[in-house]
């Protein structure tokens, strides 16, 4: 997060406003989404059970309006998040490019030209995508999670305990996976640098390659570099993909538990059918929020390496510094050089 704070320095006011407005709209969207299952439960338990058509129509219209309002909040939140993330990436590219212009040959050689190109392109794109996800999903998912938990306790506090049992079963494996995946993504980005360097060398020396008939050797060099990227990416992704099946397993087990206990509560008369249906909806919202949070962590793991690489360039001390108060020479009196 320290890297992200450094990258946010100098962000223009209009992009800061977009970055602040988007989360507010997302919170409005989530509140309406959480209220919809409760309205649906009232329609089933009161309107349909009592054959009250007027009640069903009234609350049905309220539910439709809530859904449309939630859609509107979501659309505008997406727009503002996109504007903020694109402006964020633009700011980083400008800062990187301006910094590189001051680099001496020693500074450039320290990073290599191919690495600087990767940092200006792939790393900035990864950081942009993560920033957009932070604005949207880092607000939406935790807020949805907390709101759905509160509503589930409001409906039936005993049934809500199932969620408290499911959360550690998802959180602990996700934390272990993320911790082990981060070094692998770092290695993958280094291999990207090598791949870009191989392509750059081939393009710069294309005349020499053709003159000395070295095409096959260059193709082999490219294959080795490309396979290194593929191998490290596969190693990292093999860990990350374990998240989804673990979460789905926990989600389905939770649904089974809710249906089992909920059915018994309905038979005992301590719970109504509409409440059980809304409870399942809240379960889906809670577990989907956890799944999205895990995806955010995956993106953070990938982009953390990218952000660190960008900050390395921005924090690099320039070997040769121009005089701060130097003035351009406008005239030379006698043409002599001293």
Where are these predicted regions, by residue range?
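Transmembrane helices of ABC transporter permease
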Residues: 14, 18-31, 42, 72, ...
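Hydrophobic alpha-helical transmembrane bundles that constitute the permease/transmembrane domains
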Residues: 23, 27-38, 64-75, 126-130, ...
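Helix-loop-helix
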Residues: 51-56, 151-165, 235-309, 313-314
